Amino acid sequence: MKLCAVIIASLLVCVAVASSSDNQKEFAQEKEMTREETQSLGEHEKDDEVTGSEERSCIEEWKTCENDCECCGMSTLCAASWVDGHQIKLCRNEGGKLKKVLHFIQKSVSKIKSCKK
């Protein structure tokens, strides 16, 4: 019975941590939006002129990258792999935290069921 209580408590802690990190990301995105809104129209026009010649693109999954910001998608990360002694960084879809939390919940439920037997 104590094991079941520990599993349930750890499950609640993991869900709380996952939700707080999502809230931090939302706050950061809102903060970024307000920064963009406060710029003057002239600055926007200058930025568009300067960056108009530059290519704005994101790297698709399983193509080489340098950091996470270059990869397309929220759950896509720039992960390093070693091939023939050389490090290669590729954009990979890791499924995000939601997938990991759901997998943890599934494992916890199966352990709780086995505790009841």
Curated annotation (Swiss-Prot):
Residues 20-55 are annotated as: Disordered. Residues 23-55 have a biased composition (Basic and acidic residues). Keywords: Disulfide bond, Ion channel impairing toxin, Knottin, Secreted, Signal, Toxin. Residues 21-56 form a propeptide. Belongs to the neurotoxin 03 (Tx2) family. 02 subfamily. HNTX-XV sub-subfamily. It is found in: Secreted. Transmembrane segments: none annotated. GO terms for molecular function: ion channel regulator activity; toxin activity. Residues 1-20 form the signal peptide. One of its GO terms (cellular component) is extracellular region. This is Hainantoxin-XV. Its main location: secreted. Disulfide bonds join C58-C72, C65-C78, C69-C115, C71-C91. It comes from the Eukaryota. Expressed by the venom gland. The presence of a 'disulfide through disulfide knot' structurally defines this protein as a knottin. Putative ion channel inhibitor.
